[in-house]
Regions:
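C-terminal partner/receptor-binding element of secreted or periplasmic proteins
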Residues: 16-27, 114-134
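Disulfide-bonded cysteine motifs in exported proteins
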Residues: 46, 80, 118-121
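Mature extracytoplasmic domains of secretory-pathway proteins
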Residues: 48-102
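Short, compact, well-ordered microdomains
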Residues: 94-119
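Bacterial N-terminal signal peptides
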Residues: 1-7
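Generic marker of residues within folded, mature protein domains
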Residues: 3, 20-22, 79-81
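N-terminal trafficking/processing presequences and adjacent post-cleavage segments
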Residues: 8-66
Length: 134
């Protein structure tokens, strides 16, 4: 099974259209490197020990990639809620390239592509006990 990462650059209301070129991620290749991690990059009152409960499974990451919409870097960095808790890992593209990904507890994520581009994602429809309430 493959998941699609969106590659277009046309923005409408802060999100990207799904109608353009796509790149497939091999679902079985999703590797979680860090789970329940804490980052000081986000200002907030979350403590590192609170992040230990944010544990994503491979299926959760796959569902995130499948359901998430692409957003602009501006929306990701300034407009969407953020959290200190995150998971990160790697995945293989159908063409053999490897991407790095990161998903936070506020349902924001990004994928660093082999060519250096970053795809920013947001998934308000993603549901699991580990994500913060919408």
């Amino acid at each position: 099974m493959t998941l699609l990462l969106l590659q277009n650059h046309g923005a409408v209301a802060g999100t990207m259209s799904r109608d353009n070129a796509e790149r497939a991620v091999v679902r079985e290749s999703i590797e979680i490197i860090r789970d329940g991690a804490w980052s000081a990059d986000i200002s907030g009152d979350e403590r590192a020990d609170a992040c230990s409960a944010f544990i994503l499974r491979q299926a959760d990451v796959g569902a995130f990639f499948k359901r998430a919409s692409r957003v602009t870097e501006r929306a990701y960095s300034h407009d969407l809620d953020a959290t200190n808790c995150y998971a990160e890992g790697r995945a293989r593209l159908a063409n053999g390239g490897v991407v790095k990904w990161k998903i936070d507890q506020a349902r924001r994520g990004f994928v660093s592509m082999p060519d250096g581009r970053t795809i920013y994602l947001y998934c308000p429809r993603c549901q699991t006990d580990w994500f913060a309430p919408n």
